[in-house]
């Protein structure tokens, strides 16, 4: 039986994924900003799927996603582009009592349900991302 170890400074990034990895630069920019603040990140497309090298059926993907969330100290939701999986991951993290930082770009709509379970909501641009990440993560 595999033992899960909670890593105090590890975040799960919930974000809409694309088969062509069109938002990989955004994912990498977010993760780099977290890492500069001393936080490890877990990203399904990178860490489970190896940027398309490995595929999962939906049931196994969600099971593995939940397993990874259980090893993290918090969840960061990037909701500029909506996705059903993102909402499922956020709901799971909330049910587990994890803090949730919701990030979205200035033009994006914030779902009221996600706002209701978020520890903090912040709008950002890539230009101001690094300067704000440390303050946002103080809540974790």
Q: What are these language model-derived features?
A:
Residues 1-140:
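Conserved catalytic or regulatory cores that recognize and/or transform ribose-phosphate-containing ligands
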């Amino acid at each position: 039986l595999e033992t899960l170890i909670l890593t105090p400074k590890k975040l799960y990034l919930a974000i809409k994924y694309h088969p062509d990895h069109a938002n990989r630069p955004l994912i990498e920019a977010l993760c780099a900003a977290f890492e500069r603040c001393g936080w490890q990140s877990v990203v399904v497309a990178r860490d489970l799927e190896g940027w398309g090298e490995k595929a999962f059926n939906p049931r196994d993907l969600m099971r593995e996603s939940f397993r990874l969330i259980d090893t993290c100290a918090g969840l960061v939701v990037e909701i500029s582009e909506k996705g059903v999986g993102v909402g499922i991951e956020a709901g799971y993290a909330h049910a587990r009592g994890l803090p949730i930082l919701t990030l979205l770009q200035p033009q994006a709509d914030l779902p009221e349900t996600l706002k209701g379970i978020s520890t903090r909501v912040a709008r950002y641009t890539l230009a101001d991302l690094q300067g704000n990440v440390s303050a946002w993560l103080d809540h974790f």
